[in-house]
Design a protein with these regions (language model features):
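Short hydrophobic faces within alpha-helices
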Residues: 31, 49, 117, 121-123
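Glycine-rich helix-loop "coupling/hinge" segments at transmembrane-helix boundaries
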Residues: 63-64, 68, 162-176
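Anionic-ligand binding region
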Residues: 119-123, 130, 134, 153
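Membrane-water interface segments at the C-terminal ends of transmembrane alpha-helices
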Residues: 1-112, 136-161
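Glycine/proline-centered hinge or cleavage motifs at structural transition points of membrane proteins
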Residues: 125-126, 139
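Membrane-helix/interface signature in polytopic inner-membrane proteins
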Residues: 108-119, 129
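Short, conserved glycine- and acidic-residue-centered signature motifs
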Residues: 42, 89, 118, 170, ...
Length: 176
């Protein structure tokens, strides 16, 4: 029995959750500070899009953008010498994109539940916005943030559709 797909999946999900966790938290914080409702709704829709798209469609979009002839893929190949499509990095990219909405939505929900009086009190004590985020908001939202991380890890671990589209099914390299 070949266990390399299990090992590749575990490595991919572990590295992907590091990116997803940070990006999801930062995106949730960024959305909370948007003043315009139209801007919030637009970006919230963009951030949650991979959650409602079929995985193969999301993988197709990733292939279009990050493939050898796509705008981002061509840039990476020509200027950095890095080929994204059909590589192990593509499995990480697919896992990050597909698991990001779960982390983002969980973090946003947890951050929105924080009592605003705590934030106002921290501001009156002279804390910077980033200090408030790390010392007040994250500790109070930690259960929701952790649950988002667990959901995102599970989604990244089980991702196949988008991965098959952008990374292929190369034995010992991208087969998840």
């Amino acid at each position: 029995m070949d266990i390399s797909p299990i090992i590749i999946s575990m490595k991919t999900a572990t590295i992907a959750i590091l990116f997803t966790f940070i990006l999801g938290l930062l995106a949730a914080r960024w959305i909370l500070y948007r003043k315009s409702d139209a801007t919030r709704i637009f970006w919230d829709g963009i951030f949650t899009m991979p959650l409602v798209l079929p995985p193969t469609v999301a993988g197709f979009f990733l292939l279009v953008f990050f493939g050898s002839y796509g705008p981002v893929g061509k840039l990476f190949e020509n200027y950095l010498g890095i080929k994204i499509a059909f590589s192990w990095g593509a499995t990480i990219l697919a896992a990050v994109v597909m698991s990001f909405p779960l982390m983002y939505r969980s973090a946003r929900g947890a951050l929105e539940q924080i009592d605003e009086d705590l934030i106002f009190a921290a501001r009156t004590l002279g804390m910077s916005e980033w200090s408030i985020f790390f010392r007040v908001m994250i500790p109070n939202a930690l259960p929701g943030i952790i649950s988002g991380g667990v959901l995102a890890f599970a989604r990244g671990l089980g991702e196949f559709g988008a991965t098959a589209m952008i990374a292929g099914n190369i034995r010992g390299k991208t087969r998840t």
